[in-house]
UniProtKB/Swiss-Prot annotation:
Fe cation binds at residues 330, 336, 366. This is Homogentisate 1,2-dioxygenase. Keywords: Dioxygenase, Iron, Metal-binding, Oxidoreductase, Phenylalanine catabolism, Tyrosine catabolism. Its cofactor is Fe cation. The active site is at 287 (proton acceptor). NCBIfam families: hmgA. Pathway: Amino-acid degradation; L-phenylalanine degradation; acetoacetate and fumarate from L-phenylalanine: step 4/6. It comes from the Bacteria.
Length: 432
């Protein structure tokens, strides 16, 4: 499909009750489901949470569309499925990958998905599946994910995400979130694209509580952007693909499913520029817990325990006195999947490059490599700015099982443990 070059418009805020109409008066006034909707549209509700959730937790959007979503033939299971569907046995070993190679054959967003790891089947209301995407052509079909909410983290190439509620344009250093069940199409603006995805099977992502930080800081609500209504009135045949319990199913439509003329609600897609994150850090000593870098979180029923946290390590000043400044050596209850969008990560002098990834599972010891450690111990502790960098982490409370495909890819580094092998004992009981 041809890309529409019309400049995109957005609405600002997080968790708002938004409304938008592409034609004047398309939104009903004072009710959701009138006997006759304006312009001959059909009213349809998209529920992102159960009806009886607390009002503060409820997610739903009313859509006013040209053709109801219910008008479709039976779905058929596709022969080509997502790579990495088969999970391997759990491993406590630390894993790291080089950037995955971009495809040589024409590959759209769906065909270029590789599941890296997961910790829950799609029929459970908790857990996360982690993917990388590799593409070199725009989608000519539409897709929705019945298994979870999608958090997209581009690393290479700009994307235009054409959704039922409007279009989002995202580039590396921005993220996008698409609600469970929302139909969309991915168009490539730069020819090739690579990035990461967290498929959240649990509670919808929200901003973390700030506690003693106060009422401002980290990701500020006004910097999240939601699209305005934008519809396609096309009667050309089109394939609609859905992901259902981990498998791809498809049917053929006689119209575009991106035909929503007006809508209102809070179950919406959105984007966020990571460069607007208000980074918090120490101005005295020690390295605070990395939870201070949390952008979004999906909570569990246990207070403070996340189903998934999305954490970034952005450009920042390091000023701590008498302190080992890199992230410390660590054994964590949580499971950490990391990626790198640009630059270098301050705990790894080499081997972890943009487009790469790593997985440190529950209680797997990790921390700065030997070179980074030696430099930090000997460093002159002047104020130092870590610049031109953006690493991130998907942190989850359930153990991640890598996929068989992720363990068999040539990008897997078989010598990852070697980065700590040259750490030597400097213990001297005679000298404090």
């Amino acid at each position: 499909m041809n890309l529409d070059s019309t400049a995109l418009a957005y609405q600002s805020g997080f968790g708002n009750e938004f409304s938008s109409e592409a034609l004047p008066g398309a939104l009903p006034v004072g009710q959701n489901s009138p006997q006759k909707a304006p312009y001959g549209l059909y009213a349809e509700l998209l529920s992102g949470t159960a009806f009886t959730m607390a009002r503060s937790e409820a997610r739903r959007t009313w859509l006013y569309r040209i053709t109801p979503s219910a008008k479709h033939p039976p779905f058929r299971r596709l022969e080509r499925q997502i790579a990495g569907a088969e999970l391997d046995a759990p491993t406590p070993n630390r894993l790291r990958w080089d950037p995955l190679a971009l495809p040589e054959q024409p590959t759209d967003f769906l065909d270029g998905l590789l599941r890296m790891a997961a910790n829950a089947p799609g029929d459970k209301p908790a857990g996360v599946s982690i993917y990388q995407y590799l593409a070199n052509r725009s989608m000519e079909r539409c897709f929705y994910d019945a298994d979870g909410e999608l958090l997209l983290v581009p690393q290479l190439g700009r994307l235009r995400l054409c959704t039922e509620l409007g279009a989002l344009q995202v580039e590396p250093l921005e993220i996008a979130v698409i609600p469970r069940g929302m139909k969309f199409r991915v168009e490539l603006l730069d020819g090739e694209a690579r990035g990461y995805i967290a498929e959240n099977h649990g509670a919808p992502l929200r901003l973390p509580d700030l506690g003693p930080i106060g009422s401002n800081g980290l990701a500020n609500p006004r910097d999240f952007l939601t699209p305005v209504a934008r519809y396609e009135d096309s009667r050309q045949p089109l394939q609609l693909v859905q992901k259902y319990l981990g498998e791809l199913w498809a049917c053929e439509l006689d119209h575009s499913p991106l035909d929503v003329v007006a809508w209102h609600g809070n179950n919406v897609p959105y984007k966020y520029d990571l460069r607007r994150f208000n980074t918090i850090g120490t101005v005295s000593f020690d390295h605070p817990d990395p939870s201070i870098f949390t952008v979004l979180t999906s909570p569990t029923s246990v207070p403070g325990l996340a189903n998934i946290d999305f954490v970034i390590f952005p450009p920042r000043w390091m000023v701590a006195e008498n302190t080992f400044r890199p992230p410390w050596f660590h054994r964590n209850l949580m499971n950490e999947f990391m990626g790198l969008i640009q630059g270098a990560y301050d705990a790894k002098a080499g081997g972890f490059v943009p487009g790469g990834a790593s997985l440190h599972s529950c209680m797997s010891a990790h921390g700065p490599d030997a070179e980074s450690c030696d430099k930090a111990i000997a460093a002159d502790l002047k104020p130092h700015r870590i610049d031109q960098t953006m690493a991130f982490m998907f942190e989850t409370s359930q153990v991640l099982r890598p996929s068989r495909a992720a363990l068999e890819t040539p990008a897997l580094q078989n010598d990852y443990d070697a980065c700590w092998a040259s750490l030597v004992s400097t213990f001297n009981p005679q000298r404090r």
